[in-house]
Amino acid sequence: MQIIEIREPEQADFKQERQIAVGIDFGTTNSLIAIAANRQVKVIKSIDDKELIPTTIDFTSNNFTIGNNKGLRSIKRLFGKTLKEILNTPALFSLVKDYLDVNSSELKLNFANKQLRVPEIAAEIFIYLKNQAEEQLKTNLTKAVITVPAHFNDAARGEVMLAAKIAGFEVLRLIAEPTAAAYAYGLNKNQKGCYLVYDLGGGTFDVSILNIQEGIFQVIATNGDNMLGGNDIDVVITQYLCNKFDLPNSIDTLQLAKKAKETLTYKDSFNNDNVSINKQILEQLILPLVERTINIAQECLEQAGNPNIDGVILVGGATRIPLIKDELYKAFKIDILSDIDPDKAVVWGAALQAENLIAPHTNSLLIDVAPLSLGMELYGGIVEKIIMHNTPIPISVVKEFTTYVDNQTGIQFHILQGEREMAADCRSLARFELKGLPPMKAGYIRAEVTFSIDADGILSVSAYEKISNTSHAIEVKPNHGIDKTEIDIMLENAYKNAKIDYTTRLLQEAVIEAEALIFSIERAIAELTILSSESEISIINSLLDNIKEAVHARDWILINNSIKEFKSKIKKSIDTKFNIIINDLLKGKNINQIK
């Protein structure tokens, strides 16, 4: 397979007289920074000659210390989170318990003798990466492409961008980590087909399906597990060592487990003075975890429509374990691509995309997807989905909405995220109101609502009312972060509750239709002097009573049947002229349009 030439040439000039942009992989465990020139990639090392810089930050002697494996760890997991979420999630609380300011109304950490927000602390890591690169390249760096997990939501993405901005970077693009890894393989160069990216990092698992046609990278589905990664493998091995050799469940035993795992990626056994474990035992221990990742990958393929895939791209240090390659091949019977260092694939892709974005003539395009559906709450609590799950982005969708009651001078918009049919079951992202509308009859006002997601996955919503020329726009920045686990739960709940949700929606829609019909007909009876026959009015009221009883019974089939009965008997029993009026009302016309 032809791939982009990715090497670290001794003679390459990475500080030419041209624009320079770097790629940054801000990881949970380690971070990397790289630069590409003429499609050749160089990972920039730290001052102590490390390419993988631990994503840790400490504050001692009035200075920030980055990468010494002390202090605050895994800050990436805090992006987009609220104080409430931290307090209610033991795994997150354990990360920050020594720094958390529980008296604050928002998430702040007591760090560097100050109360700092997560982006302010993360910015120090970006500054460290920036300084290391500037020192080696002997030039100022201001532009970067930064990778994020495929399931990062708007809040998390926004905080990553803010941290980078504080550090002095202009973020050219946020790209999903699996997409960056695929880009690193040079699949945009005379390659066509569908590829599965299997990304098993230290703390998370991501899988994406990408379609590549004529230099266009399109993500068509994503899936993952935020609580599954190489760290879980370490825990399983640690538990085995504790039970088998009567060792304490301590940091030292965990480090021993990690060493055993790494050794068994290239040897058949691991032995030291205290323990011994062989490859066969390791594989028995971790097989259930590996099978979970395979199942998630297969679910992702189903979401994508079960396309024929041409290869599996491995990303993340944990994929060095031979069992993972073996099980992937058994499951998919296709090429397993691992010829790029899995720890570097993401940052290489980011660096190549950075060069591509600043080059005079770009020759490739990355298209990501929305991880969850986005929509609005309608009357009755129904969700109108506007951008669907796994829709390619960037995208802009326009829909028209109207008022439900007379003399509304404002329309409230409730933006939602999720797969369920009712607003109460989805995640609230934002609310805003379009004010100053002219008081008019229901149905006259027309508001155009535009949902737009940019290439970085940031959502903006605007509304425009034509008659009053009133508009309002917001960039949706949710107050709550949403990680992959929550997304998976949302999708799973949507699947499990699909039938219930569908029935609930049908009922609510039937109730809304019935209430609108009752309102319109009763108003017509009161306002139109053409109705002189008491017998006609009696027939109509009797039919309306049937509809009201059906609504009270909360039976959508009964409601629909009573509405059908109303329409049928009206045609047969009512005066022709009034029949025409009723039919116009049933078609949604306003009473004033047909007086």
From Swiss-Prot:
Protein name: Chaperone protein HscA homolog
GO molecular function list: ATP binding; ATP hydrolysis activity; ATP-dependent protein folding chaperone; unfolded protein binding
Secretion signal span: none
One Pfam family it belongs to: HSP70
Biological-process GO terms, alphabetical: iron-sulfur cluster assembly
Keyword Hydrolase attributed: no
Homology family: Belongs to the heat shock protein 70 family.
Gene expressing this chain: hscA
Highest taxon of the lineage: Bacteria
Protein role: Chaperone involved in the maturation of iron-sulfur cluster-containing proteins. Has a low intrinsic ATPase activity which is markedly stimulated by HscB.
Keyword Transcription annotated: no
PANTHER family hit by this protein: HEAT SHOCK PROTEIN 70KDA
Alphabetized UniProt keyword annotations: ATP-binding, Chaperone, Nucleotide-binding
